[in-house]
Every structure is written in structure tokens, then in C-alpha cells.
Swiss-Prot record:
It comes from the Bacteria. Its main location: cytoplasm. The lineage of its organism: Bacteria, Pseudomonadati, Pseudomonadota, Gammaproteobacteria, Enterobacterales. Its EC number is 2.7.4.6. PANTHER family: NUCLEOSIDE DIPHOSPHATE KINASE (PTHR46161), NUCLEOSIDE DIPHOSPHATE KINASE DDB_G0292928-RELATED (PTHR46161:SF3). InterPro entries: NDK-like_dom, NDK-like_dom_sf, Nucleoside_diP_kinase, Nucleoside_diP_kinase_AS. Keywords: ATP-binding, Cytoplasm, Kinase, Magnesium, Metal-binding, Nucleotide metabolism, Nucleotide-binding, Phosphoprotein, Transferase. GO terms for cellular component: cytoplasm. Homotetramer. Its cofactor is Mg(2+). This is Nucleoside diphosphate kinase. GO terms for biological process: CTP biosynthetic process; GTP biosynthetic process; UTP biosynthetic process.
């Protein structure tokens, strides 16, 4: 097992449902520690920058509009195989395909409003973490 960090977003629809605490409890019960977190309301420019890899995709404008529609929680999760574990907790991107008990099965409203985002690889995690957090913002958990 490899101790690693991953990046996570609780999206506007899940924040609006007051699901932050319930989602954080799922991370922690799966052995992931929250080592940085903050609430932000993305500007269009920030959302376009974060999702730049999807700029040419047909869903890009809708995604940016959704991600700027309300506040989000961004967090860094740390644990053994954090990227894989978080993706298991989240469930399939399309909530109709998500297994019962996953975050998307429980909190998503649609494919676009799918409640959470999580890095898909350690390299993506590193890039996404750096987009929102400086090294000084991250508090390694020693206890």
C-alpha cells in the first residue's frame, strides 16, 4: 500500500443539500484523512482553468456554468491508495451506473450534477491540489 494524496471536490448541488458533513464522514470511515479543505465559489475563469482539459468537449460550458452556480468544498485527502479509494467511494461518473452506497448514487442529481469530483491518477491529483492549495495549506496528519 502506498500513502498518497488525492484531490476532491464536493460540488454545488451536494453543498446545497447540506451533505458536506455526510460526505466527509464517508472519506474518514474509509480511512482517508482530510489534510486541507476550504469552501470557495469559483469564478468562471477559475472553473475554465481547472477544467481546461475538457475545453473542446460538448459538455464544457454546462460544466463551467454548474461549477460556478454555488459554493464548493475543495479538499486534499491522504491515505493508502487514496486516489483509488476515493474513486471507489465516489462511484461511477454517471449516477445511474453508480453502485448503491456510493456518493454519486446517494447525492448526484444527474451526469453533470454528480455531487463530487476526484482525481483520476496521482499525476492529476498533484496538479489539481496545486491549483487550489499551496504546500503551506496542507497539514500532514501525525496523530
Amino acid at each position: 500500500m502506498t500513502l498518497e494524496r488525492t484531490f476532491s471536490i464536493v460540488k454545488p448541488n451536494a453543498v446545497a443539500k447540506n451533505a458536506i458533513g455526510a460526505i466527509y464522514a464517508r472519506f474518514e470511515s474509509a480511512g482517508l484523512k482530510i489534510v486541507a479543505a476550504k469552501m470557495v465559489h469559483l469564478t468562471r475563469e477559475q472553473a475554465e482553468g481547472f477544467y481546461a482539459e475538457h475545453r473542446e468537449r460538448p459538455f464544457f460550458d454546462g460544466l463551467v456554468t454548474f461549477m460556478t452556480s454555488g459554493p464548493i468544498m475543495v479538499q486534499v485527502l491522504e491515505g493508502n491508495d487514496a486516489v483509488r479509494r476515493n474513486r471507489e467511494i465516489m462511484g461511477a461518473t454517471n449516477p445511474e451506473s453508480a453502485l448503491a452506497g456510493t456518493l454519486r448514487a446517494d447525492y448526484a442529481d444527474s451526469l453533470t450534477e454528480n455531487a463530487v469530483h476526484g482525481s483520476d491518477s496521482p499525476a492529476s491529483a498533484e496538479r489539481e491540489i496545486a491549483y487550489f492549495f499551496s504546500a503551506d495549506d496542507i497539514c500532514p496528519r501525525t496523530r
